[in-house]
Design a protein with these regions (language model features):
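Exposed, low-structure sequence patches enriched in small/polar residues
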Residues: 571, 619-625, 629
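Short, small/polar-rich motifs associated with maturation and membrane association
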Residues: 1-385, 397-399, 403-405, 460, ...
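Outer-membrane beta-barrel channels and translocator barrels
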Residues: 133, 230, 345, 356-357, ...
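Surface-exposed loop/interface segments of Gram-negative outer-membrane beta-barrel transport/assembly proteins
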Residues: 114, 230-330, 372-379, 383, ...
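Short glycine/proline-enriched loop/turn "hinge" motifs that connect secondary-structure elements
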Residues: 352-357, 525, 589-592, 623
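Conserved alpha/beta core surface patches that mediate binding of polyanionic ligands
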Residues: 344-348, 615-618, 628
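Structural motif corresponding to the C-terminal cap of alpha-helices
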Residues: 367, 371, 494-498, 556-558, ...
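Residues on the lipid-exposed face of transmembrane beta-strands in outer-membrane beta-barrel proteins
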Residues: 225, 350-354, 384-390, 488-494, ...
């Protein structure tokens, strides 16, 4: 009875401690100007990505870590506040007049924050540059309220899955539309150097991205690249060095002793349940059964027995534990063998900007080399950008923006719940199975080239991934992608006079293109693993994407008597997209290390594809506000 009472006490105490780890904070956010609730205000725990947004009544509820002391409350056009954590809050937000004078990049133009009625979030370059990310989409992590970002593969250079407007159908894409310098972007998002970005605006509601039609149904991310600044030539050189590590700790897994003791316990439980033996008799029977069935678990001649005693003598039947005088013949941790030791990340950026004779220019070069958490994985990127804007007359301006990027990635299998996924299989592999081939003394064996030989488990039990070694695929197989990305944007603008009868009237023509040349390859060695039965396999594919957009926009933006503001847009846009691909797969290599199709004997697959489509749009938008309301 005392033991039961003690256990109940511990259980209740544990529940109380778990509950105490977070504190529920509720409250309302109200405008100090009119005492009306603020809808969509962002409330974030300072220094974390834990946050929420207010509902239609300006109310919110948030589970805050008990260690947190401060909440950051923000909203477009309001001053950001830091509030002390309390269980019930009533937050008054003050108008930020300086912020209201800022402009928001919207579809086919800009708007003042004060008069903008849609839902948008602006991320300026100061926040972007504080994050050492390789992919633009990663810069959105935790910075935009209501936007869900998920990092899936963890491969170096990979981005985040961005969901702005929630999930639709199961099979439909949730990806937002990316717009770079006013033109929808079809290139690789990782081809854009985050250091070249001036700001990003996330258009979250349907009205804000309506002019893009169905392409903007999942939300729109407006990317504005850096432009030249007035003044003399300014040169900036930026260098970053760092190391990567796991964001979350590894799962706790069994060691060799714990694994064998668990096997013994399962045999013992079976003897009790199936044969009705007493615990003492079941222990003896279990040890005998383990010894007779050793080949099914430990392979031929108990080659996967990591201890220096045979299985029948390894477990103490009284305690169910591995005998204390047993020592390990070998020990190889699969996750340790797979992961790199402090993978290096290095980045260099050269930026030059200035102006001369009413012409502003910006030129940048960038290089990124990012090693992955898994050995042999890597991402490299070379980028170059030129932005030029010039004013020929007070009624005639033009500009050009070009970007080139070459990316190269060496990857691994990490995106499936299968044995080929290294993170998945390395943590599920029983600790008694070694990564490398071992001699009778438990020492690693080396091949003629001096490299350690991997154990593909040809005598490993079928339930333990026989004839496969996921870690060996990092070294013996190859997975890679090489991309060349070229993008261009150009415009010419007439009008936009500051006075006279045509004040506020402007005609702009924009042209932009995106070109991607992508080469993928997958190589399986001819000796072991996935393609050993066909003496190796090599698959290569080439994809070419080309799109261009040409639009003509007529805008009229004028304010009368400092009270009435009219913003009118009418336009036409033509969009054309083409994709072509060519792929082939061959098998039958005379030896390993051949990475060209000509070296193989048998064609197993060959295909090609070409597709295209066009979109023609007519645009219209009219806005009116009275005294910026």
């Amino acid at each position: 009875m005392k033991k039961l009472t003690y256990l109940l006490f511990c259980l209740i105490l544990g529940i109380g401690m778990a509950t105490a780890q977070t504190t529920k904070v509720t409250g309302t956010v109200i405008s100090a100007d009119d005492n009306e609730p603020i809808i969509g205000a962002s409330i974030v725990v300072k220094g974390t990505m834990v946050g929420t947004v207010t509902d239609f009544d300006g109310a919110f509820s948030l589970d805050v870590p008990s260690s947190a002391k401060t909440l950051v409350v923000s909203y477009v056009g309001m001053k950001t506040q830091e509030i002390e954590v309390k269980s019930n809050l009533r937050i008054l937000m003050q108008t930020d007049n300086q912020s209201l004078d800022e402009v928001v990049v919207v579809a086919y133009g800009t708007a003042k924050k004060e008069s903008f009625t849609g839902s948008a979030e602006i991320i300026k370059n100061e926040k972007i540059e504080k994050r050492t990310v390789a992919n633009v989409s990663k810069a959105l992590d935790g910075l935009v309220a209501g936007v869900q970002t998920t990092s899936g593969s963890g491969q170096p250079g990979s981005g985040s899955s961005v969901v702005i407007r929630g999930f639709g159908s199961i099979k439909a894409s949730q990806n937002p539309l990316y717009v770079v310098d006013g033109i929808p972007y079809d290139g690789n998002i990782n081809a854009i150097n985050p250091n070249d970005i001036e700001s990003m605006t996330v258009l979250k509601d349907a009205s804000a991205g309506a002019l893009y039609g169905s392409r903007g149904a999942n939300g729109v991310v407006m990317i504005t690249t850096k432009k030249g600044k007035d003044g003399a030539l300014l040169v900036n050189l930026k260098a970053n060095w760092g190391i990567a590590s796991r964001a979350i700790p590894r799962y706790e897994t069994m060691d060799e002793r714990g694994y064998l003791e668990t096997i013994f316990q399962s045999y013992k439980n079976d003897q009790i349940a199936s044969n009705g033996l007493s615990p003492e008799a079941a222990s003896v029977a279990a040890l005998t059964a383990m010894g007779s069935g050793a080949k099914a678990i430990f392979g031929t001649n108990q080659m996967y027995n990591p201890f220096n005693f045979p299985i029948a003598e390894l477990i103490d039947p009284v305690t169910g534990k591995v005998r204390s005088d047993a020592t390990l013949r070998y020990h190889e941790d699969w996750m340790d063998e797979a992961t790199a030791n402090n993978p290096l990340r290095q980045e260099y950026v050269l930026n030059m900007s200035g102006s001369q004779n009413k012409t502003k220019y910006m030129f940048s070069l960038g290089y990124l080399n990012e090693d992955g958490l898994l050995k042999t994985t890597n991402f490299q990127r070379y980028t170059g950008r030129i932005n030029v804007d010039t004013e020929y007359k007070n009624w005639l301006t033009a500009g050009l923006s070009t970007n080139f990027a070459h990316t190269k990635s060496n990857t691994s299998q990490t995106s499936t719940s299968a044995s080929s996924n290294i993170f998945y299989s390395a943590q599920l592999m029983a600790p008694i199975f070694p990564v490398h081939q071992l001699d009778e003394n438990g020492q690693i064996m080396y091949g003629a080239d001096g490299a350690p030989m991997f154990d593909y488990g040809s005598t490993r039990p079928a339930g333990a991934n026989a004839n496969f070694n996921s870690i060996a695929t990092l070294f013996d197989d190859k997975y890679g992608t090489n991309d060349d990305n070229v993008s261009g944007r150009t415009y010419i603008s007439l009008g936009d006079l500051k006075d006279g009868p045509l004040q506020g009237l402007k005609l702009t023509a924009n042209f932009g293109f995106d070109y991607v040349n992508r080469n993928n390859f997958t190589y399986y060695n001819p000796y072991f693993g996935n393609a050993a039965s066909v003496k190796g396999m090599l698959a290569k594919s080439n994809y070419r994407y080309f799109s261009y957009t040409f639009n003509q926009l007529l805008t009229y933006d004028r304010k009368f008597n400092d009270k009435h503001h009219i913003d009118f847009l009418a336009g036409h846009e033509y969009y054309d997209y083409e994709v072509s691909s060519l792929s082939a797969t061959k098998s039958g290599f005379p030896f390993g290390g051949i990475y060209e199709l000509a070296g193989a004997t048998t064609i197993t697959d060959a295909s090609s594809l070409k597709d295209s489509y066009t979109i023609e749009s007519y645009l219209f938008r009219a806005n009116y506000d009275y005294m910026d309301k």
